[in-house]
Amino acid sequence: ESSEMSGESSSRTSLDIPDVQRTLFKELLKTGKPVVLVLFTGRPLTLEWEQAHVPAILNVWFGGSEAAYAIGDVLFGAINPSGKLTMTFPKNVGQIPLYYAHKNTGRPLHEGKWFEKFRSNYLDVDNEPLYPFGYGLSYTTFNYGDITLDRTSMPMDGSLTAKVILTNTGSRDGA
């Protein structure tokens, strides 16, 4: 979406990619050439169609004057994409608001029970977002080892330190 479509005083009832852009994108996919959706946006969008039809989505938000160089380095494999989402992307605007580590309805859908009447879960979509807070992929793989905490309990306003052994098990550098 354009920068004028997000931010203060820029509310939209649909969080889909604008129709003219989706039409162009569908035409590009018809060519049979490899296509990557490079997503310039200032907010989470609903991308279920794109996720189902596109082999790769790179969310770049709105970058600065050198963004094109950085995006090119990622697309051509010079560097590894390593960002994680700072916001949750919904499947549908009806799921909004979505919060990290919170159930999004009063009584969420039970595993394996798609339709339950008289519950405040969604009847037409599951409870999971399209992309949760912290989601992100990489050109490499990692193994997470044991986690240790510096204490077994924490007071209300306290803090703790967690340590984890992280090993890059892939053939590429990554973060």
PLM regions: where:
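Secreted, periplasmic, or luminal enzymes acting at the cell surface/secretory milieu
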Residues: 40-174
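Hydrophobic helix-and-loop "lid/oligomerization" segment in the mid-to-C-terminal part
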Residues: 1-53
